[in-house]
C-alpha cells in the first residue's frame, strides 16, 4: 500500500451505496428495461428525447441475465435512480386492508432521520454486502436443485408405464421418396435469412418519413448496411467456412453415425451467419442433384436463449423433427415423453431415416448444474445409427473448461474458433455491402474499422455505426434541400440556385456517431468513484487481451494492483474490492455470471458493450491523463 502523503495523485474514498428500500418499484423498473431478453449483443443507443427514461435505457444496457441481477437487488441499491431518491416504498398489503387506506398512507411515511440512520448503519458495515450476496446466491442455487429434482421425479413417474411409445410408431417411419419432405424443408429454409440477427436497432434516430421517401445515396447505403440485408456471401471467414463445410460433408457421406462440432467466438464474429451460408449452399446443391449425392438432410435450428427452460429443448426438437411428414401434426406431449421418442429415433437402425443437422445457437444458455441437456445433445450423435450432426455455437471461448468430465468426453475435440475481425476484414465487409455505392469516403471506412477492431471486432457494430453516419449525413442533406426549396419559393430572390448534391459520408460523421453513443455513458461514469472506474477498466483490458467476455474476480484484483502501483495510488484491500464489485453490480455495470458465492475464480461480465465502455473511459477526466492505456 502506498502512503497517501507520498502519492502523486489523491482521490476521494470509495463510494458506498445503501441498500435499496424500493423493492416493488425497482422490480417494475427492471421489467421495463427487459424488452430484448433474447439479445446478448446490445449496442449503444443515441441520446434519448424522453427525459423520464431510465439511465439503463440511455446507455443501452442489455439485460440478458436480468433474472440473476434481480436476485441481488435486495442487497445492492441502484444508485442511478435519482428521480426516486427521496421516496420510500413498501410492499402492498392484502386486498382486505383496502378500507384502511388512510392508515396505510400514514405507515408509508417515514422520518428522514430513520432513513439516514439505516443508510449510516449500512455504510459502516461493508461486510454486509458479502453476506447478502452469498445468501441470495445460495438461495438461487437451492431453487435450481429443486427444479432438477422435480424433473427427475417426473421422469420416474413416466417410467412406471404411463407412456406408451408404440402409439408414436409413425414418428420413426420415414418416407423413402422424400420429394414432399424436401419441398417442405426448402420452403421452410427460404424463410430463414442467413444473417438473422436479433438486436436492438441503433437507428433509433427519429428519422422522418421523408428520409426514406427520397431515394438518394444515403438511404440506399442504409438499406445495404442493414443487418437484415442478406449478402450473397460472407467475406472474411473463408478459412472457417471451409473447415465447417468439410466436417458436415464428411458426416453426410458416411450416412451412419454423426458428430459434434463446437464453434466459439465473441458476438458479431459471423459464427451463425457462416453456418447458415454453408447450409444454404448444401441445400441448393441437393436441389440441383435431385436429393442425391448424399446431401439429403433436414436442417433444424434452435436458439437456447428462446427457451424458458433448457428441458424445453426436447419438446421443440421433437416437433421440428416430425415436421418432415405432412401426415403428422404436432402433438402435445411433455418434454420427458419427447426425450424418449427422440432417443428411440436415434437408436433405431433404419435405412430410410433422414440425416439431420441441428444448429444449437446460444448453446451456453443450456448449461445447468447437472448438465443433463447438453450431455444428451452430445451423446446422440455418438450412437451408431443416429445420422445426426450437432453444431453448438457459444460466445464463450473457454466453455469446455466449465463442463463436467462426462460431457467433455462426449463433446469431442472438434472445435472451430472465430477470432474477432481485424481492420482489413471489417473494411472488406463494409465495402462489400456497399458494392458500387460511392457513399463513404475511404477515410471514414478506415476510421470506423480501426475503432471497432481495436475494441471488439464486431462486424454488426461496424455496420450499425456506418448506418448511423449515413443517417446524420442524410439529415444534413435534407436541411439543404429545405433551404433550397424555400429559396426557390421566395420570389423576391433574383435568379435560381443549384440543387444541392449529396456529398460523401466523411470521418466527421463517424466521429459524431461515437460522440452520440458516449454522451449518456459519460454522465453515468461521472457518478462513479475513481476506483470503480479502475475496476471497469481492468475488465475492459482483460476482455481485449483474452477475447473472452467473462473475467475472473482474482484476475481483476491482480490487474488492479498492477495499475495502482504504476500510477502511484493506494490499492483497495480485498474487502474494499468486493464492495466495488457490489456497487457496480447494483448500478448494473456488471453481471454475475453464475449463481455461486463469490470467490477468486468467480466470473464477472460487463453489462454494456465493451467498445462503448472503453471509449467512455478514454474520455473520462479521471483516467484519460493517466498512463494506464498499456496495462
UniProtKB/Swiss-Prot annotation:
Compositionally biased tracts (Low complexity): 1-14, 22-37
Binding site for Mg(2+): 361-362
Role according to the record: Component of the origin recognition complex (ORC) that binds origins of replication. DNA-binding is ATP-dependent, however specific DNA sequences that define origins of replication have not been identified so far. ORC is required to assemble the pre-replication complex necessary to initiate DNA replication.
GO molecular function, one term: DNA replication origin binding
Segment forming the signal sequence: none
Gene from which this protein is expressed: orcA
Protein location: Nucleus
Principal location class: nucleus
UniProt GO cellular component terms: nuclear origin of replication recognition complex; nucleus
The organism's place on the tree of life at top rank: Eukaryota
Keyword Translocase in annotation: no
Keyword Flavoprotein: no
Biased composition regions of type Acidic residues, renumbered to the chain: 91-104, 141-160
InterPro entries: AAA+_ATPase (IPR003593), AAA_lid_10 (IPR041083), ATPase_AAA_core (IPR003959), ORC1/CDC6 (IPR050311), P-loop_NTPase (IPR027417)
Single GO biological process annotation from the record: mitotic DNA replication checkpoint signaling
Protein name as it appears in the record: Origin recognition complex subunit 1
Biased composition (Basic and acidic residues): 55-80, 105-133
Renumbered residue ranges of the record's region Disordered: 1-164
Entry's family note: Belongs to the ORC1 family.
Entry binding sites for ATP: 230, 265-273, 362, 395, 460
Assembly with partners or alone: ORC is composed of six subunits.
Organism: Dictyostelium discoideum (Social amoeba)
